[in-house]
Structures are given as C-alpha cells and as structure tokens.
C-alpha cells in the first residue's frame, strides 16, 4: 500500500481538527499553531499559540464546547468579539483576529500578556497600597474607555486582570501594568443556561447587587464600578470583602447586608481609600 502524501496527511489532520475539540499542535487556517492550554472559564478555553506568518506568540480563545453548537451564541460570540476589538486601550487585552468557519470552532485571537494574573499575585499576600491604587486606577481608565463605547465587562475578578511585565522600564516607571481580559465577552452568557439550572452572570464574590438579584436588564456601568471597590479592598487585604462561603448567604450579603467594617485607619491606610471603596460599593435604595 502506498504511503499517503504529506499534503493528504495535512488535509486529513485539518479535517480531523475541525471535528473535535482543539488541542495542542493543531494548526488553524494555516496561520495559528496551538501550543499549551492557558485556562478555561464559562465562555471558553484559552490556548497559547504561535502566529506562523508573523513569527510571534499570541493567545486564542475558543467558544466553550457546550456552546459551540448553538448558532445564536456563535453570533453573539462574534458580536462581542467585534465590540472588544473596537476598544483599543493600553489596559485592555487587544483582540487581533476573529474566525468563524461554520464547519469549525469559532475563535478569537488576542495579544499574549507575559506575567501573572492578579489572583496569582494575591495568593502571595496583599499589595502595597501605592501598587494597589495604581493598578485599580489603570482598571478605572480601561472602564471609562469601554463604558464610553457602551461596553460593560460584568465579570471583573482577579482572574480576569493580568499583570503584564514591562521588559525594560525606564527610570521611575512601573515594571507591571494591568490588562483587562474578556472585555465584552461575559455579556454573551446573559440568560444562557450551561448546566441546565439557571446561571447568574458574574463571579459571586465580585458581582453587584443587581447581578446577585438576577436583574440582568438593569446591569450597567455601575456594576463594574461596584466590582472595582470590591477588588481594591481585596488588593489591600488579600481577603474578600464578602467572605461567606455559602453561595446563597453571600448573595444575600451582597444584596442587602451592611458593608463590612473596613478598619483601614487602624491598618495605617489613608481614609481616602476607605471612602473610595464605600463610594464604589454604594447601593441605590
């Protein structure tokens, strides 16, 4: 039996990759080669990848396996990718490409941020106050730019905030900058049931009261601002502002409980920081 030509093997490999979940070694559209997976979440799975033509690394997000067969969600995935692409902000992870061949898995291509997530950093302990304030200021700058374009994140959390390292910072310049991941993508899951049991959009510890109530129709930029206050508290303490382990108790705490005492003055932190957190997490009666 004659051996199959290399071109035939490549075509067969590409066709096989289209039928199964993406994995390391796959080549997409003769442009991107997948390497190791970087992580997964409610929207999809992310791989480190290599741009074969430009010879540079990138990151690729695929739609979640349980969502890929839903035509409506594929359309929403494309729409949200387009929204995120338009943002173009130094503190928002850049979207550089989007592909959606009906016979394949839809995916978007992002810049690869070298560094660690805020979650990884907080596992080592609280941040120094100047660093915490600077990172949250960079987050606020990104939010202002996005909100002006009508794009709301809705799922801000330490896992979605990357601390990108600066190769050669100048004198007095910081060696890390914050980059926001998944801008615009969390909205696409609004009202979607992945597990068959209803699903709240947002991470429990960081969701706003309206998200905790399930009032997705009134979620707006203020929900992101609430999350900034919760994140600033955690940056300074390495503890969650709403610490109940039970989901329902935490939800009720977010919806209506009095904001826990911050005691920042006792910890030697400026009173202004406490005022900022209190203002961000102010409930509307």
Where are the regions that the model predicts?
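Conserved N-lobe loop of protein kinases adjacent to the ATP-binding glycine-rich P-loop
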Residues: 50-57
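Activation-segment/catalytic-loop signature of the eukaryotic protein kinase fold
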Residues: 98
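AlphaC helix of the eukaryotic protein kinase fold
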Residues: 64-86
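Protein kinase glycine-rich loop
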Residues: 35-42, 46
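Hydrophobic/aromatic scaffold residues of ePK-like serine/threonine protein kinase catalytic domains
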Residues: 86, 135-136
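Conserved short submotifs of the Hanks-type protein kinase catalytic core
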Residues: 103-117, 121
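Activation segment of protein kinases
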Residues: 19, 69-72, 165-217, 245
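C-terminal lobe helix-coil module of Hanks-type protein kinase domains
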Residues: 137, 143-144, 159-162, 203-285
């Amino acid at each position: 039996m004659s051996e199959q030509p290399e071109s035939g093997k490549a075509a067969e490999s590409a066709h096989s990759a289209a039928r199964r979940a993406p994995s390391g070694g796959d080549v997409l559209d003769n442009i991107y080669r997948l390497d190791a997976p970087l992580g997964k979440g409610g929207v999809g799975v992310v791989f480190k990848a290599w741009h074969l033509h430009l010879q540079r690394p990138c990151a690729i997000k695929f739609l979640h396996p349980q969502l890929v067969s839903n035509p409506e969600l594929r359309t929403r995935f494309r729409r949200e990718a387009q929204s995120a692409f338009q943002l173009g902000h130094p503190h928002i992870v850049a979207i550089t490409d989007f592909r959606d061949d009906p016979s394949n898995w839809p995916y978007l291509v992002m810049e690869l941020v070298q560094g660690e997530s805020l979650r990884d950093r907080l596992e080592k302990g609280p941040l120094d106050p100047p660093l915490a304030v600077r990172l949250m200021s960079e987050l606020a700058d990104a939010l202002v730019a996005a909100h002006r374009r009508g794009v709301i994140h809705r799922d801000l959390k330490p896992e979605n905030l990357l601390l990108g390292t600066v190769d050669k910072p100048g004198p007095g310049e910081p060696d890390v900058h914050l980059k926001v991941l998944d801008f615009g993508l969390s909205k696409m899951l609004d009202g979607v049931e992945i597990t068959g049991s209803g699903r709240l959009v947002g991470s429990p510890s960081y969701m706003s009261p309206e998200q905790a109530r399930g009032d997705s129709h009134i979620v707006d930029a203020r929900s992101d601002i609430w999350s900034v206050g919760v994140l600033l508290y955690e940056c300074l303490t390495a503890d969650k502002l709403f610490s109940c382990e039970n989901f329902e108790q935490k939800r009720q705490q977010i919806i209506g409980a009095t904001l826990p005492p911050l005691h920042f003055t006792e910890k030697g932190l400026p009173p202004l920081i406490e005022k900022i957190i209190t203002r961000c997490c102010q409930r509307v009666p």
